[in-house]
């Protein structure tokens, strides 16, 4: 995952958070494909995490950690996307949004550290 790929992954994660948040703000009215939204193995980040390069840049503990939080990130996107598809905010949507935002920031921080190691 070169610098450009890491930057693209960062933008993609920020994009997910923005799409979800603007959905609850009524700005984004898209319908979420929940099957692809929850599939944490289908995105570029998951592909990179399966490669040796990620192990070398992250180390085994950070790599395992980012894999776990990345999976949770996609679960949250699915839960929130389902609420948006139904045009209803669940009782815990604020907590889910806060968790999504926190996980996204943590993923970005880990990716920035990996990018800086590669430079």
Question: Predicted regions span which residues?
Answer:
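N-terminal membrane-sensor/transducer module of prokaryotic signaling receptors
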Residues: 1-119
């Amino acid at each position: 995952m070169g610098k450009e790929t890491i930057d693209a992954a960062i933008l993609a994660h920020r994009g997910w958070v923005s799409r979800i948040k603007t959905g609850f703000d009524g700005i984004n009215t898209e319908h979420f494909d929940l099957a692809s939204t929850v599939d944490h193995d289908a995105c570029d980040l998951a592909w990179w995490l399966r490669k040796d390069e990620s192990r070398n840049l992250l180390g085994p503990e950070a790599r395992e950690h980012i894999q776990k939080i990345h999976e949770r990130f996609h679960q949250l996107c699915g839960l929130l996307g389902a609420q948006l598809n139904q045009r209803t905010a669940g009782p815990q949507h604020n907590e889910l949004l806060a968790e999504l935002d926190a996980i996204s920031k943590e993923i970005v921080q880990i990716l920035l550290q990996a990018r800086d190691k590669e430079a």
